[in-house]
Structure formats: C-alpha cells, structure tokens
C-alpha cells in the first residue's frame, strides 16, 4: 500500500488529492490546484475568435487533438471539454515541477464554499502538470471536468488504513490539520478556515460541526454521491458512449453531441472494463514477479562476483609468488587490472539493481492502485479512468520487456594467467583474455496453451525460460511411438513451434523437448501427454488426384470430366486402428462401375482402382459387385447401387482386414485380409458418377460387437 501513495498525490501541491477532477488527458488535479494554475488567454486566442477566423476543427477527442493540433499554429484548440492550446510550451511563470502557475484572477469570495467553486475567468487556459498539454476552458470552466469519485474513495480508504491525520480542505498553501467537520457542507476545516469561511451565524449557525474522526466515519457510512453529467448537471449517467469512451446521460443521447453515437449499457461496460483491467493486471503481475526474481538474481550476482574476485585474486597471488622477485613488479599491475574489472562489474550490476528497484516500486504502486480502483462499485467513476489505467498498465508491462530483465554483466572474470614464459620474459607477462566456456542452455518450457492435436497431427510450442541468459542454437523435439515405447527425434532446428503429421488415431503420445548449443544439450522439458482424435475427419486431396477429377463442396464431393476411370485419394492416411467412412452416390448415369477402397500414395491414377498392386477395392454397378486387387477379380456378389445409395468402407488395421457395406448391409465376405502398412481412402469414377464423402463416423455397432466377441 505504501508504494501506491505516489498515485494518490496531486502533482501540483504534492498532497493527497482533494476533490480531484479528471482532465481530458486522463490525468487528475485537485480542484483548487486546477484553479491556481489557470492562465487567462487573450480574447483573440479564445475558441470563439479562432472558430470565427475559419481555422476551427470539429469535436475531436483529446487523442485526435493531440495528434492533429498540439503543435499547429492554426489549431482552434476546441474539444469536448475545451481544447488544447496551440502552443503548450509558451514560457511563463513556473512552479518547481515545471507547471505554469498563476495567482487566481480574482480573490476567493469570503464564503463557506471552496475557492475552487468560484467563477472561472473567461478565456482561461490550463496546462496539465504531467503531460504538459494545454487546454482552453469553455463557458463551464472547471465544472466541465468530471470529478474522480473513485480516486476520492481510494484515498479515503488509504488514509484510514494509515490512520493519517485529516487535513483542512480550504487552506490555500500547506493544509493544516483539521479540527472540525461540517456534516452539512461535508468539508473539513482547521480553526482559522472555520472562523473565516464558516462563521457560527446566519444559516451556518444551524450546521452541525463534529470532530474529524467522527466526520470520517459518517462520510464513510453515507452513500457516495452519484456522478452526474458534465453537460447536464442534474442528470445521472445512464449509458456509455463507445465512440467518445465516456459515460453519458439520456439528454446527451436525445439532444447532445452523442445522439448519433453507438452507446452501450453502463453496467455492461463497467464489467467489461473491469475485466480488461484485471486481465492487464495479470500480465503486469507476472512482469512484477519476474522483476522480483530478477532482483534476487542480481543480488546473488553481487555475492558471486565478490566470491569469484577473491578466488581469482588468491590464484593470481599464488602464481605470482612462484615467479620469484621479478614477478612482484608485475603483480601490482595485474592486481590493479583485476580490481578495476571487479569494480566495473559491481558498478554495472549495482546500477542495474537501482534502476530495476525504482521501476519495480513504480510498477507495484500502480498495481496496488489499480486493485483498489477495481474494488470500487461506482461504474461511472470507474469508466472515467479505466481506459487510462488500462493503457498505463499495458505501457508499464511493455517497459519490462525489451531486455530490461537481462543482466548487463556476467559474474565470471574472463581472464586467465599464462605462467609458462621463461623468467627473462617476465616483463612481457600480461593477461591473456579468453572467452569463458558457455554453459548449456536452460531447459525449454512447453507452452501448454499453444499445444494441440487435430486428427492425427500434433502441434507443439515451447520457449526459453524468461530469465535465461544463455542462448540456444536449436531445439530437439522427441515423441514416443504412441504405445509407451522409446522416444525418437521428430524435429531438430531453431524454430520454437512444430507440427507433427502422420500420427496414429485414438492414440496417446508423450512429447518432450531439449535445447542445445556448442557446449552441449539442456535437460529435457517436462513430458506433455497428447491424445489424437478417436475418429478421422478428412476430405479428398486435390494435390494427389488425377487432373480430370472435379472437386466441390470443400473437396468432399467429386466427379470426373472424362469417360475413363480416374482415381482420387483422401488427405489422411491410416496405419493403425479401426476406421470407417461412407460415400453417397449423388449421380449415377448409364450404369458405370465406380470403385471404392484404399490405396498406397503412389497408386496409378489413370485406371480403375484395384488394377495395380497398390490398391484394394470393390467396384460395383447397378446389379452386382466384385473385389479387385492387382487386376484380380474375386467374390462376385449380387446387389448393386443407384442414385442415393451409400457405400461404407471399414478398414480394421488391428485385425488387418478390409470390409465393404452397401446401404448399411455388409457386401459379401471380408474383402481382404493381411492388409498392413499406410493406406489412404480411395475412389475411382468417370463423368457418369458423382459421390460425396462422409467422415468422422464411428464404427458400426454390429461390427464392434462382433469384434469384441472375437
């Protein structure tokens, strides 16, 4: 919580925000501080006069204004809350933090109201103290900026957790400790401000003044004020404008500038932005965790450098002492070089520790602040700051990348003393710098969210650990045989993603990966278990088909442009398991005899399926069918096909059999036995036939029952 305090303090006064308002650039200011840094612009630079000169622009949001006109001399400077001035760097009186500070244009009225509520001079300009964007106020003045109720709630909870003394809300300079609180005005006063702004007379005499602690409790228990529309102060926010990214009321939708914009429900957008902020925080939290581990690593490096330095110096002294008196003259010089290298390494590491510590503290503070903001139940107030917080979180997360978490210095001393020269060559003795042997790479991490299987293919992805400093020259991916057997290499290369095809269906595979470089190989990663699909989904393969084959229906339907038989294969091959697919006859003219079955990848494509020794098929006409392999015709069976008929093909590689079905009835005996190897579904047909393929089908129930009995 302490690191969040920077998020809760005004950049102008340095104190906790009091009645904060939100500028169009998403930064916050105390309302009183905003009045103190107002600048009155000449009449000729007002938005009205600039629009009259013909150089005005339409109502852009502040990001577009920033891009288009922040440094443009012809910019009108008019926006939805006002506009950015065209010359934000105009020199004028400045506070220590570079913010332009001018005294109020008129003294605050001697009333019990805050000076920030007094009228704002016409043609006033305000510069954000953080991004230094200048903004010309419209007729509403500071009332045109929404109040940050969420930030007020976070500050109140923070002060309660710290038991901080409540400060006066009306002190113009350093706020004094409050002595009372007015329950009606909801304002904390010190004694001088109470006497000046809240005298016990007139209508104020009836107000109830209580101790600050009691007032804090009553304020916490009382319902928080609902945020109202800046354009229609009597209306509460009811919807969210997607284009302008801001809450709006119903009057804005009916008659205001949001009437033609896309709007969404306030509650739905509140939940959506909370979800987006939470997701962004998850990424930033991971970065912060890595940063903490990185700092531990850096601090360990300091100790290792100290230890290695001591060890190296001792070795150096021992070698120098062995080279008699002549070595003593060089010993001092060599020790000086070692110490210089030692100090250089320490300086680099300590500088990096300091830099990362500051960045981590800022990151932690932003995280704690965002977590407190998420606890708020004010949708309107939350949506006013959520976009800016989400951008800050993403920006902070990005800043932790780009090599930030990589050590700038190694712990080893890349020096080696060569003590072989003769005594008369001692004056030439010097360090010989050698490259230290590089360690093996760290163990790769399999990225489970990117690993998947499809049909009989598996895609695996991996990465190096985030804190690894040793580069890998490549990776070796290994899979077992799907039956718990030995692992075998399936990929060797530099890529961190690989797709393995041709696996068995309905099988479980174990995968692992290791990295290698010139020094050696890393340990294996954790083993990942992959399950391939139980049934196959596939289509016909245009790449391997005869050129006369015509494809349609996403390659599930085929016919032919020739009167001769032509062969087309399926995209998926089978070498293990039980597989079943069907083909429906969409068109059947002039009683042709198409063939259905399986084939090797190199089957002849310009003749009927089964005429060579690379295919096993059943060809059928309108009356009967035959089985055919290597041009041998067997098992003539009565019963043919017509339009609408269904051909089923059952390939059982566990029992090494091929069986055919016509209209859900087995056609003849088992067609072929002792079939083994890699088979592709296959069809041969001519222009008189059109068939459609149906895949992903379970094995017929009667066959499953018969197989279990057998």
Swiss-Prot record:
<keyword id="KW-0863">Zinc-finger</keyword>
<keyword id="KW-0966">Cell projection</keyword>
<feature type="binding site">
    <location>
        <position position="229"/>
    </location>
    <ligand>
        <name>Zn(2+) 2</name>
    </ligand>
</feature>
<feature type="modified residue" description="Phosphothreonine">
    <location>
        <position position="41"/>
    </location>
</feature>
<dbReference type="GO" id="GO:0030425">
    <property type="term" value="C:dendrite"/>
</dbReference>
<feature type="coiled-coil region">
    <location>
        <begin position="273"/>
        <end position="340"/>
    </location>
</feature>
<keyword id="KW-0206">Cytoskeleton</keyword>
<keyword id="KW-0963">Cytoplasm</keyword>
<dbReference type="InterPro" id="IPR001870">
    <property type="entry name" value="B30.2/SPRY"/>
</dbReference>
<feature type="binding site">
    <location>
        <position position="252"/>
    </location>
    <ligand>
        <name>Zn(2+) 2</name>
    </ligand>
</feature>
<keyword id="KW-0175">Coiled coil</keyword>
<feature type="zinc finger region" description="RING-type">
    <location>
        <begin position="10"/>
        <end position="50"/>
    </location>
</feature>
<dbReference type="InterPro" id="IPR003961">
    <property type="entry name" value="FN3_dom"/>
</dbReference>
<dbReference type="GO" id="GO:0019904">
    <property type="term" value="F:protein domain specific binding"/>
</dbReference>
<dbReference type="GO" id="GO:0008270">
    <property type="term" value="F:zinc ion binding"/>
</dbReference>
<dbReference type="GO" id="GO:0045955">
    <property type="term" value="P:negative regulation of calcium ion-dependent exocytosis"/>
</dbReference>
<dbReference type="InterPro" id="IPR013083">
    <property type="entry name" value="Znf_RING/FYVE/PHD"/>
</dbReference>
<feature type="zinc finger region" description="B box-type 2">
    <location>
        <begin position="224"/>
        <end position="266"/>
    </location>
</feature>
<dbReference type="GO" id="GO:0016567">
    <property type="term" value="P:protein ubiquitination"/>
</dbReference>
<feature type="binding site">
    <location>
        <position position="258"/>
    </location>
    <ligand>
        <name>Zn(2+) 2</name>
    </ligand>
</feature>
<dbReference type="GO" id="GO:0016079">
    <property type="term" value="P:synaptic vesicle exocytosis"/>
</dbReference>
<dbReference type="GO" id="GO:0005737">
    <property type="term" value="C:cytoplasm"/>
</dbReference>
<feature type="domain" description="B30.2/SPRY">
    <location>
        <begin position="533"/>
        <end position="702"/>
    </location>
</feature>
<dbReference type="InterPro" id="IPR003877">
    <property type="entry name" value="SPRY_dom"/>
</dbReference>
<dbReference type="InterPro" id="IPR003649">
    <property type="entry name" value="Bbox_C"/>
</dbReference>
<comment type="subunit">
    <text>Interacts with SNAP25.</text>
</comment>
<dbReference type="GO" id="GO:0005856">
    <property type="term" value="C:cytoskeleton"/>
</dbReference>
<dbReference type="InterPro" id="IPR050617">
    <property type="entry name" value="E3_ligase_FN3/SPRY"/>
</dbReference>
<keyword id="KW-0808">Transferase</keyword>
<dbReference type="InterPro" id="IPR027370">
    <property type="entry name" value="Znf-RING_euk"/>
</dbReference>
<feature type="modified residue" description="Phosphoserine">
    <location>
        <position position="46"/>
    </location>
</feature>
<dbReference type="InterPro" id="IPR013783">
    <property type="entry name" value="Ig-like_fold"/>
</dbReference>
<keyword id="KW-0479">Metal-binding</keyword>
<dbReference type="InterPro" id="IPR017907">
    <property type="entry name" value="Znf_RING_CS"/>
</dbReference>
<feature type="domain" description="COS">
    <location>
        <begin position="374"/>
        <end position="432"/>
    </location>
</feature>
<keyword id="KW-0862">Zinc</keyword>
<feature type="domain" description="Fibronectin type-III">
    <location>
        <begin position="440"/>
        <end position="535"/>
    </location>
</feature>
<dbReference type="InterPro" id="IPR017903">
    <property type="entry name" value="COS_domain"/>
</dbReference>
<dbReference type="GO" id="GO:0008021">
    <property type="term" value="C:synaptic vesicle"/>
</dbReference>
<dbReference type="InterPro" id="IPR036116">
    <property type="entry name" value="FN3_sf"/>
</dbReference>
<keyword id="KW-0832">Ubl conjugation</keyword>
<comment type="function">
    <text>E3 ubiquitin-protein ligase which ubiquitinates itself in cooperation with an E2 enzyme UBE2D2/UBC4 and serves as a targeting signal for proteasomal degradation. May play a role in regulation of neuronal functions. May act as a regulator of synaptic vesicle exocytosis by controlling the availability of SNAP25 for the SNARE complex formation.</text>
</comment>
